[in-house]
Amino acid sequence: MQNKDACKSLSSWVSLSISLLVLTVPLIWPYNSTAFPIYAQQNYESPREATGRIVCANCHLAKKAVDIEVPQAVLPDTVFEAVVKIPYDTQIKQVLSNGKKGGLNVGAVLILPEGFELAPSDRIPPELKEKISNIYFQPYSPEKKNILVVGPLPGNKYSELVFPILSPDPATNKKASFLKYPIYLGGNRGRGQVYPDGSKSNNNVFSASTAGTISQITRQKKGGYEVIIKTTDGREVTDIIPPGPELIVSEGESIKADQLLTNNPNVGGFGQADAEIVLQDPLRIQGLLVFFASVILAQIFLVLKKKQFEKVQLAEMNF
């Protein structure tokens, strides 16, 4: 009985510790509070919409290029690598959630064909493990092992990511077939401009909520600004600008509704790319090799037969 109580107490303590860790991590590293792809996992059953749009684009509004490299074809039950490239100028800095400047983080979601999944550690060759380094990949959900997510990671170290992938074997996986399959990639560098609830992050532009004249601008102690706009009917409307964006207006200036009050601090962006891969049937390859061998042998026999015929003709002419 005492052992059961002790186990319950230990379990409660572990749960409490994990909860506290989850709550305090964003406070210690505030720039991860808008990190991807955790928002997509929490809010969407699938990261790819019916239109082909990856949901990360809902929060990361700017477009930037990404690239993916995979083999043209793979054999069943084989480990191969998918190389994801998220290029950007590593010298640039982004606005963090506290308004300060810092390095960009990167992340990616890789949507594989059904049956393809993250390769088990004991199946990954040593040379591939070196390329992966200490990167932690995870499935999008327990039901969607073919969708892999990674990040956020320091962009200056991981602008190129290597995913270890295990191909399915149609002999044991009835859902897999020897076909050509599409692979979809979504990759991002930097923080998002919008939170999942639709509110703006401080990595966005801010505009005036009403038309009027800016009567007062007050810089806040923790950063950011309080902009008071006096309307034509004498009302005073206060717009709050969080730390990060810089004001591009001044006191006494007349402004219109929705006129920009700040610059655009965002230096990152999200991009999509796709590729194709063939799950190749080994018997098909063997059949192709046999066909090529038969063609080569037929050519050899044809040449030999021709030479033999020429020798016979030459002998008859000499006779």
From Swiss-Prot:
Heme binds at residues 36, 56, 59-60. One of its GO terms (molecular function) is iron ion binding. Keywords: Chloroplast, Electron transport, Heme, Iron, Membrane, Metal-binding, Photosynthesis, Plastid, Signal, Thylakoid, Transmembrane, Transmembrane helix, Transport. Its cofactor is heme. The chain crosses the membrane at residues 285-305. It is a single-pass membrane protein. It comes from the Eukaryota. Belongs to the cytochrome f family. The 4 large subunits of the cytochrome b6-f complex are cytochrome b6, subunit IV (17 kDa polypeptide, petD), cytochrome f and the Rieske protein, while the 4 small subunits are PetG, PetL, PetM and PetN. The complex functions as a dimer. This is Cytochrome f. It comes from Staurastrum punctulatum.
